[in-house]
Amino acid sequence: MAFQAVCILVGVFVCSTYVKGSPQPQARVYLTFDELRETKTSEYFSLSQYPLDYRILLMDEDQDRMYVGSKDHILSLNINNISQEPLSVFWPASAIKVEECKMAGKDPTHGCGNFVRVIQAFNRTHLYVCGSGAFSPVCAYLNRGRRSEDQVFMIDSKCESGKGRCSFNPNVNTVSVMINEELFSGMYIDFMGTDAAIFRSLTKRNAVRTDQHNSKWLSEPMFVDAHVIPDGTDPNDAKVYFFFKEKLTDNSRSTKQIHSMIARICPNDTGGLRSLVNKWTTFLKARLVCSVTDEDGPETHFDELEDVFLLEMDNPRTTLVYGIFTTSSSVFKGSAVCVYHFSDIQTVFNGPFAHKEGPNHQLISYQGRIPYPRPGTCPGGAFTPNMRTTKEFPDDVVTFIRNHPLMYNSIYPVHRRPLIVRIGTDYKYTKIAVDRVNAADGTYNVLFLGTDRGTVQKVVVLPTNSSARSELILEELEVFKNHAPITTMKISSKKQQLYVSSNEGLAQVSLHRCHIYGSACADCCLARDPYCAWDGHSCSRFYPTGKRRSRRQDVRHGNPLTQCRGFNLKAYRNAAEIVQYGVKNNTTFLECAPKSPQASIKWLLQKDKDRRKEVKLNERIIATSQGLLIRSVQDSDQGLYHCIATENSFKQTIAKINFKVLDSEMVAVVTDKWSPWTWASSVRALPFHPKDIMGAFSHSEMQMINQYCKDTRQQHQQGEESQKMRGDYGKLKALINSRKSRNRRNQLPES
C-alpha cells in the first residue's frame, strides 16, 4: 500500500509539473451550437426526440451514403446533407426476447432493445448487419441496391444468430471488419460477458477464435477498433489488427492494471492441426504506451485507449496510427493523443517475445530457440511461400504461440511522448479523426478531437524542432446542443465534411468555415488555418496552385506583417473611439474582448495631449480577459484608453475608450427620485446626452431611474400638468456651476 501511495503521488507530481510547464491552450474561436448553425456549415439529424444511441458504422463515399446503427433502427443517410429524409429499416428485437431480457434484470431502456453494432459491406448490393437483440444477438443481410438512386433499403433474409459476431450487451463495444465475405469480430460471445474472443465467421472454411479463457491471450478486454493493414507487397502477408485495452493482474494478484494493447492475426489462419484446433495460430499482441516522462525518469501513463484513427499513406509502412488515451487513476483525470509510426509497430512484432518463468516472476525477453517459421508469420506469404495453410505449421510453432503471444518490447509513440496532453480540464477526448492538408508553407495533419461534452476541437500541431511541438486549437464547435458525449466520428476528405454521432443525434460539419475569422487580411493570417487563405478580397478556402503570391497564408508563423503588405494594415490597426462615463468612487468596467484568447492585452492611457503610458495595474485597477476593471474611480483615471492586442508579434488596437469621470454628488442629485428634473426633456440644450450618463450608473442606480421613468409615464398618462414635475433644478444647477472652473463642459443652460 505504501508503495502504491508513493506511485500515485509521483504520478500526480509528474502531471502537475507537466501542466505547470505547459499551460492548457484555449480555442482561438469557440462557436456555440446556435452560432455554428448561423455559419451555414453544419447539419443536424435525429430520428426521434428520444435518445436512440446513434453509431456511424460505415461510410460509402462512392455511393454518397452513410450507414448508421441505433436502437431498433438502421439508417442510410446522404453524406452530402444528412438532414435530408433518410432511408431506414425498423428492426426491433422480438417481443419474446425483450420480455426475457427484462426478466433477467437488464435495463429495459438501455439494454432490452436491438442496438445495431455491426454494419459491413458484404458485396456490391448487400450489407451484413448485426444487433444486440435484447441480449440475444441477431444478424441479417440488408439489400441496399446496386446504386444509391435505386432507393432500395430492406432486410431480405431471415435473421440468424449473432453469437460470435456481436456482443450480447450493447454497452460492451463490438469491433469488426469484412474481408472477402468473411467477418472478423472482437466481442464477448456469451450472455454473462465473461468469454471475450476475436472470431472469424461467415466463412466457407472453419470458424476460428482466440484461445478460450486464456488470460495470456485476452484478459477482460474492451475492444476499441479493428483494421486491415498490408504488410509488404504480398497480399497473403496482410494482417488484421485489433486495438483494445485489458485488465492485467500484477505479480501479487491483488490488483489489476489497465493496459492498452494491439493484437494481430492472419486472415488466412485456419488453426492448428493437432493443437489450437479452430484457434488462431498467428495471434500476437503488444502493449501500446502513451505516457509523460518527468526529467527525473518516472512515467505517468495514460492507460485507457479510447479511439484509434489510421492516417494512410502511399506506403503502408509510413501509415500513422493516432490514438486517444485517458487516465485510469482516480487521483487525477486527463486525456492525451499519441501517434505511432506503423513501421515501429512492425518492428516490435518482429522483435523478442516476452517470457515468464512462473506466476510470481517478472516478464523477460525469451532467450531460447525461436521455431521456424517465425511465430506470427502468415502462410503463403513472402517468408512461407510453400506453406498453403497454418495446419502445415510444425507443432513447436503452434505450441510457442499458445504460450508466448505477448511481445517483450512495448510500442512507444513518436518522440516517446504524447502529441497532445490535457490535464485539469473540464472535458476528456473521446474520438479522433485526422485530415492531411496541403498549405502554402507545407503539409499539415489537422486533428479533429471529439469530447465528452459534445464539442469538436480542430487542432494543428506545428513542428518547431526535432522533438518539440507547438499546438494550436483553431476552433472548438458545439456540434450538439445538449453537450452529449461524442460516440463515433468519421471524416471525408473527399467531401470536406466531418460526421459525428451521440446518443441524441447526428451532426455534419464542414472541415472549414474561413469567413468566420474576419473580413481583413490580418484576421485570416492570424487564424493560421491550413484550409484558409486571403484571396485579396476575403478569407476563403485555400487551393494549392502555382500562383502562390495571389494567396496569402502563413500557418507556421501567422505573421500578417509579411503576408498582408498592401492591404491597409495601418487602417486596420485603428479602432473607433467611444465615450464612456464613470462615477467617482464607484466601480466601472472598460470592455475590450479580443477575437482571439491567444492574444495578449496591454492597456495604454493618454491624458490630454500627453504621450500614451502603460496603465499600472494594482488592487484598484485590474485587467481581466474581457476588459479593465477600475474600482473606486478617481479623477486621475480620466483620459483616452487604448486596448492593444498582440498576437504573433502583430499589434492592433481593439478599443479606444474616452473615459470621463462624473462627480458622485452631481449624479446623486440627478438620480434622486424625490427630486424629479424637467430640464432633461431639453435634450438639445444639454452639453451631453442623458443616455451617456446612464452608462455610468450601477445596477441599483439604474433600477431607481427605471422606476422614476415608470412613475413619470404614468403621471403623464393621467393628464397631470408638467409643472408638478419640476423638481429641484436650482440645487443641481448650483452644484454644477460650483465646478465650472474644473470642467466647463458640464455647465447647464440658463432657464
Swiss-Prot record:
A single Gene Ontology biological process assigned to it is: cardiac endothelial to mesenchymal transition
Question: A Pfam family for this UniProt protein?
Answer: I-set
Q: Write out the annotated subcellular location.
A: Secreted
Question: Which residue ranges are recorded for the region named Disordered?
Answer: 712-751
SS bond list: C101-C112, C130-C139, C266-C378, C290-C338, C514-C532, C592-C643
Gene Ontology annotations for the cellular component aspect, listed alphabetically:
extracellular space; plasma membrane
Cited InterPro entries: Ig-like_dom (IPR007110), Ig-like_dom_sf (IPR036179), Ig-like_fold (IPR013783), Ig_I-set (IPR013098), Ig_sub (IPR003599), PSI (IPR016201), Semap_dom (IPR001627), Semap_dom_sf (IPR036352)
Record keywords, A-Z: Developmental protein, Differentiation, Disulfide bond, Glycoprotein, Immunoglobulin domain, Neurogenesis, Secreted, Signal
Write down the glycosylated positions.
N81, N123, N268, N465, N585, N586
**Gene Ontology molecular-function annotations:** chemorepellent activity; neuropilin binding; semaphorin receptor binding
Provide the Sema domain boundaries: 28-511
**Keyword Disulfide bond among UniProt keywords:** yes
The domain of life for this entry's organism is Eukaryota
Signal peptide start-end: 1-21
Q: Does the keyword Disulfide bond apply?
A: yes
Question: Where do Basic and acidic residues bias regions lie?
Answer: 712-731
Q: Give start-end ranges for the coiled-coil region(s).
A: none
Record-stated family? Belongs to the semaphorin family.
Function per UniProt: Binds to plexin family members and plays an important role in the regulation of developmental processes. Required for normal cardiovascular development during embryogenesis. Functions as attractant for growing axons, and thereby plays an important role in axon growth and axon guidance.
- What is this protein identified as? Semaphorin-3C
